[in-house]
Amino acid sequence: MATESNPALASLPSNVREIIELASQRDGGIPFRAKTAHVHRTWAGTFTSLPELYIQPESVSEIQKVVRLARHARRRVTTTGCGHSPSDITCTSSWLVNLDNFNKVISVDHLTGLVVVQAGIRLYQLSDELDRRGLALPSLGSINEQSIAGAISTGTHGSGIKHGLVGESITELKITLANGETLSCSPEDKPDLFRAALISLGALGIITEVTFKAVPAFSLAWSQAIDSDKRIFEKWEKDLWSQAEFVRIWWFPYMRRAAVWTANVVDPVDLKTGAVKHREPPTSYYDSWLGYYVYHNLLALSRWIPRITPWIEWFVFGMQYGFKNGEVTRIGAVQPSQKAFLLNCLYSQSVNEWAIPLHKGPEALQRLGAWLQNLKPGDPGYVEHGIPYSAEGLWVHSPVEVRASDSTVYTSREANTRPFLDPTQSDGPTLYLNAIMYRPYHREPTYNATERYYLGFEWLMRELGGKPHWAKTFTATQADLARWYGDDFQRWGAVRESVDPEGMFVGPWHRRYLLEPLQRDRLLPLEEIQQTTKKVPARQGGGIEVIGIQNLVAPN
């Protein structure tokens, strides 16, 4: 699409316009669906950027054209979906590709369960398409807004020790590389590329096609029970995580209580009538817009009076689950799986999630709770937390989301199915702890509460042998990650180097965590580096604007 048919491109540098126009004359009219003046913002409003071009291709040939043009124009390419990662991984001042219009189901084999889809399809769209065909994904996380490529690329997971990462059912991928070529990879064909692409972090190319094994559609009967954290810890090594196929917990540190969600597969069909008997959970007036805004405004108030934060936890917990002590089953339902897994994330938030060995969960939560509550010897629930940072005057939001999985059930290094950058345990079940700090009305908590909380939280996670979730907030360094992942880290880097030697898909986030520390004489030719950042006013969405600059080394 030349600039004559797309006047918005007239604002581009003349050399870039000429490259696009020349390519449009020679490629048989393959569209280049690009626009300028797009503002990219993460879902949480934590980061924004102003890409030079925002491009929404609708076919593999269009994606290949984007990559070829970027190579000739000496531009970095970043891919984004819903922007649910609160980090700056998708921020760019160069070319931003969104695959929302590349979202079709290509084929479904009901005999094998193999489904082939275009990589831009969102998980909610995919779930609906599968349901219409009597199929489902084996497991989902708490949200379904991500594209399937984004969920794969960042290691999205659900919660249940019979399941691992959402990407565990992937059997084949197609990816468009920096040279414009689209390759297939699988455990048998180009296994190193496959293992690298399963958690690619957007640094290898653009995933275009995903083949995975679906399962017959299923419904879940779930219930939610309230218990003290002491009893949760007592049940931990008994049947806490094996009592149902899917289990997740929300822990409230100030109240020292938890909501335990359990779900099992059921057949909701009435044998007499043949009717499907789904049942929605009971609701109250507080579950409406009233509760949403009451909680939001209480969080906003706590920015100015942080000491009321534990009271807010008590009030919101009571309104949702009841104010009585002891175990109380509050709600239950029977829903289609793609609906039962979902959780309302409510408001803008920072999230910091780490994966540790499952058996270390009670120790982690007890030590974290003792630190947050400033417990002293003799206080109920006191343990020596060992965290070398003060929590005096620190008040944090709740809950801490607690989930578990076991990626060893379906994946292994030997079978070439375990991602190189899989943060889960390679020898047993994994526990995920997700520390949330809300940003009411897109404003950060005061008194550096988020930074202080995450400083202590990450110190504890490191001590317990943890690794951070790639899509969330963390402060580990490249050296830390290289040490934790060992040979797999080096092998992932070798694949990246082989498929993108000029760094077309490399930005500041990748340099920070995956590449050697920045040295001017060792920049990749197409790498984008961070030039500066600036705060965005809350009335404009808040967060930090990331401004990058290309290395722009001419090709040899």
UniProtKB/Swiss-Prot annotation:
Claim: NADP is one of the keywords in the record: no
Name of the gene: alo-1
Protein name from the UniProt record: Putative D-arabinono-1,4-lactone oxidase
Keywords noted in UniProt: FAD, Flavoprotein, Membrane, Mitochondrion, Oxidoreductase
Record-annotated membrane-spanning stretches: none
Cofactors that this protein relies on: FAD
Single GO biological process annotation from the record: dehydro-D-arabinono-1,4-lactone biosynthetic process
Reaction(s) this enzyme catalyzes, per UniProt: D-arabinono-1,4-lactone + O2 = dehydro-D-arabinono-1,4-lactone + H2O2 + H(+)
InterPro entries xref list: ALO_C (IPR007173), FAD-bd_PCMH (IPR016166), FAD-bd_PCMH-like_sf (IPR036318), FAD-bd_PCMH_sub1 (IPR016167), FAD-bd_PCMH_sub2 (IPR016169), FAD_lactone_oxidase-like (IPR010031), Oxid_FAD_bind_N (IPR006094), Oxy_OxRdtase_FAD_BS (IPR006093)
Gene3D superfamilies, per the entry: 3.30.465.10, 3.30.70.2520, Uridine Diphospho-n-acetylenolpyruvylglucosamine Reductase, domain 2 (3.30.43.10)
Domain FAD-binding PCMH-type: 47-217
PANTHER family named among the record's database cross-references: D-ARABINONO-1,4-LACTONE OXIDASE, L-GULONOLACTONE OXIDASE
Main location, first listed in the record: mitochondrion
Biological pathway: Cofactor biosynthesis; D-erythroascorbate biosynthesis; dehydro-D-arabinono-1,4-lactone from D-arabinose: step 2/2
Pfam family, one: ALO
